[in-house]
Structures are given as C-alpha cells and as structure tokens.
C-alpha cells in the first residue's frame, strides 16, 4: 500500500427528509443508492419519512463493517433499521450476481472476514 496522502474536503450536507420536505416527489422515490463510506446509517436516520412513505422503495447500499464502526455505527443496528422499516435485505453475490436473502448468509463470517458487500434492500409490499 505504501505512503498515501489523503486530502479531506468539507462539503455541506442535508438530510433527504429535509430536502424533500416540501416536494411533491417526496412519496414518489423508488430507488436510492448509497456508498458513503460508513455514513449510510446516519443517512438512513435522515430519511425515515422517505422510508415510511415510499412503498416501492429499493435501496442499494454497501455493508462494510469497519467503515460503519469507524463512523460510530453498530453494523447490527444498521441492518435492524432496514428490518424495522419493513425491508427485505438481499446480499448481491458478486460472482453470480444472484440476490441471496440475508437470512441465508452468515453475517458473522462477513463481519469476521471484514468483507464489504453490496445489499439490495427492497420494501415489502
């Protein structure tokens, strides 16, 4: 890996619930992609209204244990938030591109191997 220099850039952010608060599209959101280096849980907390209002919502997100923990999130709480909001969670198998229900996957192995996986979370209708 060698010596790598990283530059940090501060950017403004806004919660999606706030951004869409007066929008006629707030209940017409059907897809969200998140790859925000461990801040996914914080983003979900800022879109609880969107999660509740949009019955056809699908979210594609990374699940990276170390990144979540570095951001102060318990990975189990991240998954629980999806389940509490009535989402089915699938792991995207990178080799076959199949969707595997999360209950068929050994999450503890993913955690111990420190893997980064992609999840497809689809609202149950």
Residue ranges and their predicted role:
Residues 38, 63-65, 123-125:
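Non-catalytic surface loops within mature trypsin-like serine protease
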Residues 14, 62, 92-94:
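Conserved beta-strand termini and adjacent loop/short-helix elements that scaffold enzyme active sites
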Residues 22, 57, 64, 95-97, ...:
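Amphipathic, alpha-helical segments enriched in basic
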Residues 1-54, 67-73, 77:
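Short internal loop-to-helix segment that lines adenine-nucleotide cofactor pockets
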Residues 2-3, 7, 69-125:
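Rossmann-like AdoMet/SAM-dependent catalytic core
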Residues 9-11, 59, 119:
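Structural detector for hydrophobic anchor residues on beta-strands
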Residues 30-34, 60-62, 120-122:
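Short beta-strand segments
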Residues 56-58, 88:
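Proline-centered loop/turn at the N-terminus of a beta-strand
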């Amino acid at each position: 890996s060698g010596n790598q220099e990283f530059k940090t850039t501060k950017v403004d952010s806004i919660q999606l619930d706030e951004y869409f608060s007066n929008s006629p599209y707030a209940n017409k959101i059907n897809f969200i992609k998140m790859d925000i280096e461990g801040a996914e849980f914080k983003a979900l907390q800022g879109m609880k209204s969107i999660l509740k209002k949009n019955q056809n919502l699908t979210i594609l997100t990374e699940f990276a244990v170390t990144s979540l923990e570095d951001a102060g999130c318990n990975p189990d709480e991240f998954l629980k938030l999806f389940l509490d909001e009535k989402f089915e969670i699938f792991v995207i198998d990178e080799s076959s591109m199949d969707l595997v229900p999360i209950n068929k996957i050994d999450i503890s192995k993913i955690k111990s191997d420190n893997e980064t996986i992609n999840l497809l979370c689809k609202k149950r209708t």
